[in-house]
Amino acid sequence: MDEDRFNMSVRKFLKKVGVTSQRVIEEAVRSGAVKGDVLKVRMTLTAENAPIEHVIEDDIAVR
């Protein structure tokens, strides 16, 4: 395995996930779709060809 190539691929994927997720969250908050002061979020990472299922849950203060 080429460590440098692997690390760059992972970073590129995570950057894409982070940027697009932030946009979706901001859009939901700005549109008024969030009820209450906290947005409860969950991100699930899965892979088609590997036994990966990783869940991250958190609260985001919106007001």
Positions of predicted regions on the chain:
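N-terminal acidic leader/helix
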Residues: M1-V19
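Short, conserved loop-to-beta-strand elements that form functional interface hotspots
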Residues: S21-E27
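N-terminal intrinsically disordered, cationic/polar leader segments
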Residues: D2-M8, E27-R30, V34-R63
